[in-house]
């Protein structure tokens, strides 16, 4: 189905009482794959880690990477059914997939996940730091210290940990891709802590790009706008879910599959002269960087 035909009048009101959300319970299901897309070997022989790769944007990137020939480790928290579905779709492309459940906010888990990947596949070429959580609050006064620390641990500490553990295995020509957000640039009154982590990711991306440029390792980011992923019904009330994405110039939420090409570009040699940059996929909102 063409993403442009989807959800121009919003979504069915819905809410999930857990984070992370479960993709298989969403209505309609997000579009994670372009069945007409044919890979051309851009990532053939490469090995990628994708955090939060079980669903949403991470799943879409994983499927596209698989179509381009990459073997993939999927890191996820505990959404086992979504992760198994992603694994099946990856393995349909005749590449290998390793599922690694656990909390990327935990440094020890990050170290173990990288080592498992290298032990299983023999190397590592691409790191996609994509996992995130958000907890809307009407005021900063309602953001507890526990929530603040948890959001930062998942969203930005995990990127430090994963990058540190991955770096000894990355060589010239390898790539790191970080998922930031439009909220890093526009802010969001209900997502003050989340937006702060996403702003930190932009600075982290730029700083790491400078740090690793002489080693030939590229570091870039993707900044999604309002996208139809499990995080939306898992965080917002039903009425806000219904209206999600309708205020964009394109008049609809984006689909995960509409981000896949950006991740493939940044993972492949086609972005050999790009580092420290952010690709904005947001339905037409103009961003001052």
Curated annotation (Swiss-Prot):
InterPro entries with a match to the protein in the record: NAD(P)-bd_dom_sf (IPR036291), Sc_DH/Rdtase_CS (IPR020904), SDR_fam (IPR002347)
Chain spans, region Disordered: 1-39
GO function term, MF aspect, one: oxidoreductase activity, acting on CH-OH group of donors
Signal sequence bounds: none
Catalytic residues, chain numbering: 194
Record: residues binding substrate: 181
Protein name: Uncharacterized oxidoreductase YhdF
